[in-house]
């Protein structure tokens, strides 16, 4: 698959041949769903349990007589209706640490990249060489017509000037190639890859 390469000022920089094993496979909704669900579950923090009736440190003895007192019938003081009693149907401790096969994760990333290539929302640029000026970068991004939400993926590290210029731009996120993931790719309207990012992703996913 051949894709045109451009610069941030919209000038032509030739073309690049994308590996079909990484950018040309047929996306499957079930695989993408599994990977995104796994990612979001991994982000969740463990929950702390509340003390229910059996967890409260109080006597289990019936504290009043059943009949003749003129009051409602009660058992012990651990009941949820009393101050200091256990919580009714309280939260239980949960640890979110799902597992997903590495091959499925890699397949999901290839499918996410292929999905962007298939829909024409994958853009390859030469490099992220810009001045560290937010105003200039915002004008360039707007002139390129990338859409409201853009994910830019660079090579080993993100260009420092680009990172500074883009830090205050709403809807523009930047990642190094090692941080590319299914959730962020699908969440954005346009995926922008540098030549270095393409090389890194193909080396990572074509093994």
From Swiss-Prot:
Biased composition (Basic and acidic residues): 44-58
Gene Ontology annotations for the cellular component aspect, listed alphabetically: ribonucleoprotein complex; ribosome
Biological process (GO), any one: translation
InterPro entries registered for this protein in UniProt: Ribosomal_uL4, Ribosomal_uL4-like, Ribosomal_uL4_dom_sf
Pfam families according to UniProt: Ribosomal_L4
GO molecular function terms listed in the Swiss-Prot or TrEMBL record: rRNA binding; structural constituent of ribosome
Domain of life of the source: Bacteria
Stored Gene3D superfamilies: 3.40.1370.10
Keyword entries, A-Z: Ribonucleoprotein, Ribosomal protein, RNA-binding, rRNA-binding
Disordered: annotated segments: 44-82
Binding partners and assembly: Part of the 50S ribosomal subunit.
Protein family (similarity comment): Belongs to the universal ribosomal protein uL4 family.
Role of this protein: One of the primary rRNA binding proteins, this protein initially binds near the 5'-end of the 23S rRNA. It is important during the early stages of 50S assembly. It makes multiple contacts with different domains of the 23S rRNA in the assembled 50S subunit and ribosome.
UniProt protein name: Large ribosomal subunit protein uL4
Gene: rplD
């Amino acid at each position: 698959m051949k894709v045109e390469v451009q610069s941030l000022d919209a000038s032509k920089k030739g073309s690049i041949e994308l590996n079909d094993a990484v950018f040309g496979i047929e996306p499957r909704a079930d695989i993408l769903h599994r990977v995104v669900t796994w990612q979001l579950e991994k982000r969740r923090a463990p929950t702390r349990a509340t003390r229910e009736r059996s967890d409260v440190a109080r006597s289990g003895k019936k504290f009043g007589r059943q009949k003749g007192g003129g009051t409602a019938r009660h058992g012990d003081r651990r009941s949820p209706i009393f101050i200091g009693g256990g919580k009714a149907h309280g939260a239980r401790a949960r640890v979110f640490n799902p597992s997903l096969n590495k091959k499925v994760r890699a397949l999901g990333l290839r499918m996410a990249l292929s999905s962007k290539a298939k829909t024409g929302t994958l853009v390859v640029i030469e490099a992220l060489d810009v001045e560290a000026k937010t105003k200039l970068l915002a004008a360039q991004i707007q002139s390129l017509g990338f859409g409201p939400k853009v994910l830019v993926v660079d090579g080993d590290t993100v260009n420092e000037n680009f990172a500074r210029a883009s830090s205050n731009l709403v809807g523009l996120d930047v990642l190094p190639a090692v941080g590319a993931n299914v959730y962020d790719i699908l969440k954005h309207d346009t995926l922008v890859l540098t030549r270095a990012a393409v090389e890194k992703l193909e080396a990572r996913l074509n093994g």
